[in-house]
Amino acid sequence: MMEESGIESTPPATPPPPSTVVASPPPLTSGATRPQTVPSPSGISAFTPGDFSSPVPSVALTSTLPPMQSSVPPLPLSSISSPLGLSGPYGIPSASFASPAAGPPLSTGPPLGPVLSAPPMGPPTTGFSVSGGYDITRGHAGRTPQTPLMPSFSSASPMPGIVTNPMMQQPVSGGLDVSSPITFPEDVEDPRVTPDSNAPGGLWGFIKGVAGNPMVKTVLDKTKHSVESMITTLDPGMAPYIKSGGDVDIVVTSDKEVKVAAVRDAFQEVFGLAMVTGEAGQSNIAPQPVGYAAGVKGAQERIDSLRRAAVIHEKQPVVSVENFIAELFPDKWFDIGCLILDDPGYGIHIETFTQATPVALEHVQQAQSLTPPDYNLRWSGLLVTVGEVLERNVPNVSRTDWHQAFTGMSRRQMIYSAAKALAGMYKLRLPSRTV
């Protein structure tokens, strides 16, 4: 019957696959699990995408199946039907289609050869297989892949007679830490932007720009004052060095720190910068002056003694401090300090006094009793000071600073307050150019 129907009994031979397609599986003959149609002598109709009636499930054929030879003679055309419902004369194996996407129409001319199946589903490897012992330089036409695990892929042009896999090629994801050798271009400066050569730059330009700003000057002054305050708080001994200098030079007629430090702090507070030093001067009166006149006399004698001894020049501004006791009311005695500023250069002479500190009558009477009647300086005061009497009679009291024990305010603070007022009056009387 096969001879009468005009169908050749010899099955078509499958030509060897092209050398460019490496991963294509060997074609299956009519003995495969799916039937295959044979050419019909009738006319060839065009293969169009519309010939599919429903999506066809994909059948993945692996390249590990050996070629299978047919042991059954080919069947007549009438007994063979395409499982895909194709209207064309060529039955395409279902393994050739991995998705319902439509392929390109085939030519209406005579076919060049049997239709070959497409490569299996998966990422395009172009002959590359991730397996041990495989040479990674194979299949790259002599080119070195970018990384050992990610070879470079090239899309080959479709060959006639080969049905390509229309599935979208997805990149390999997960499990591979691949570092890309891609380098990015460096930023290039815009040649249209030219720097202003006239504008000052750097730290010096910034300082010149803000030097004339009054607000910045005020902030800098406050910052400087804060830094100086912090330094002097942490180390009070640094104050004379930080604020020393300027046009104000004062000599104190004593080498005792309680007097020199108080006058220095006061003048530096008023003038900002002031050089204050101490020189021991002689009062030439009794150790404990009594009365205002004796106090003023003792302070002035200290100044004159330094000038006579040429310790200071004749126009040197001098500040002298002398403490005395006075009976302001009957049987009510007070300790007072006298401060004198003498500046012969500008003809300035100022006198001021500290606050009065009460002294008990019994302590004054004891100091009087300890002074001999024939004491030669009895006209100016007493031989024994009030501080010495308090030191003998009151425990934990020093003769040099007994004011702290009786008033809570040290003698230095009392002298500082009076010296600050003295410096303020002196500043007002000085010419403006000097200030």
Curated annotation (Swiss-Prot):
Coiled coil: none
Single GO term (MF): protein kinase A regulatory subunit binding
InterPro entries per UniProt: ITPase-like_fam, NTPase/PRRC1, PRRC1
Originating organism: Danio rerio (Zebrafish)
One protein family per Pfam: NTPase_I-T
Record region (Required for interaction with PRKAR1A): 296-389
Polar residues bias: start-end ranges: 30-45, 144-157
Family indicated by similarity: Belongs to the PRRC1 family.
GO cellular component: cytoplasm; Golgi apparatus
Official protein name in the record: Protein PRRC1
Regions of compositional bias (Pro residues) in chain numbering: 12-28
Stretches for region Disordered: 1-54, 101-165
Signal peptide (UniProt feature, chain positions): none
Gene null: resulting phenotype: Knockdown of prrc1 results in small eyes and severe somite defects in embryos.
Gene3D superfamilies listed in its UniProt record: 3.90.950.10
Task performed by this protein: Acts as a regulator of the protein kinase A (PKA) during embryonic development.
PANTHER family documented for this protein: PROTEIN PRRC1
Taxonomic lineage: Eukaryota, Metazoa, Chordata, Craniata, Vertebrata
